[in-house]
């Protein structure tokens, strides 16, 4: 039996060990930014990425692009949301993210490169002892975020005036397929929507192709929309 192993061991020795080491945890910055800017969080030594959401006709409805340092800080982040007519482009400058066009200071940071304050909207963020954003608050609303032991976002609860909106996500039990999940949305404890996502993954356990099904249960009959998500990811 030992002799049968020798050719395999020799091959490994000659070719080197180039297997990708899979990182199962999410950094506080990646998890928290994904919550605030509404994209799927990624794992491992991500250098840059583009995440594109397309409808059933193949039309782009949303695109998020980011570049990260080797330490995991977002050097730049760009969000294009065609459905909500929103464009955001931020670049890192010391303790702030500036508008990429006007260079106006938009987001103040705390710690290494975590969200702290959005002065123009009067929003401030709080973190836990591990650096994850767990609360966001302003005069109009309060938000609380939840994560699992690997830092995967499990949802959030938003309270504003007399309304409470809660999103609860349940990821796959397979730690490699964390972005295979279901989620339920409640408005004042009444179910108004659900989501199901399934993906194909790369060697870093990050999604490359996903199908996202969103069901709006707040209307009768319920309306189902099917989206495709494409990820292009470069690593260090």
UniProtKB/Swiss-Prot annotation:
One Gene Ontology cellular component: plasma membrane
Keyword Signal (UniProt): yes
Cell compartments where the protein resides: Cell membrane
Pfam families listed in its UniProt record: UPF0257
Provenance organism: Escherichia coli O7:K1 (strain IAI39 / ExPEC)
Lipid attachment site numbers (N-palmitoyl cysteine): 17
Lipidation (S-diacylglycerol cysteine): 17
Span of the signal peptide: 1-16
Membership in a protein family: Belongs to the UPF0257 family.
Major place of residence: membrane
Membrane topology recorded in Swiss-Prot or TrEMBL: Lipid-anchor
HAMAP family: UPF0257
InterPro entries associated with the record: UPF0257
Key words of the record: Cell membrane, Lipoprotein, Membrane, Palmitate, Signal
Protein name (database record): UPF0257 lipoprotein YnfC
């Amino acid at each position: 039996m030992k002799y049968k192993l020798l050719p395999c061991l020799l091959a490994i020795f000659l070719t080197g060990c180039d297997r990708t080491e899979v990182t199962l945890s999410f950094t506080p910055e990646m998890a928290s930014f994904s919550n605030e800017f509404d994209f799927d969080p990624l794992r491992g030594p991500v250098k840059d990425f583009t995440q594109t959401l397309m409808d059933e006709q193949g039309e782009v409805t949303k695109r998020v692009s980011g570049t990260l340092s080797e330490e995991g800080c977002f050097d730049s982040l760009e969000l294009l949301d065609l459905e909500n007519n929103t464009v955001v482009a931020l670049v890192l400058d010391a303790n702030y993210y500036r508008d990429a066009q006007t260079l106006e200071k938009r987001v103040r940071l705390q710690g290494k490169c975590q969200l702290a304050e959005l002065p123009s909207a009067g929003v401030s963020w709080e973190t836990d002892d591990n650096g994850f954003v767990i609360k966001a608050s302003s005069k109009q609303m309060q938000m609380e975020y939840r994560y699992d032991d690997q830092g995967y976002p499990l949802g959030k609860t938003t309270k504003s005036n007399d309304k409470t909106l809660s999103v609860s996500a349940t990821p796959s039990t397979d730690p490699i397929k964390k972005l295979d999940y279901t989620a339920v949305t409640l408005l004042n404890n009444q179910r108004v929507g659900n989501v199901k996502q399934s993906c194909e993954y790369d060697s870093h356990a990050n999604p490359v192709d996903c199908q996202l099904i969103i069901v709006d249960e707040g209307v009768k009959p319920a309306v189902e929309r099917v989206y495709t998500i494409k990820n292009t990811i470069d690593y260090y």
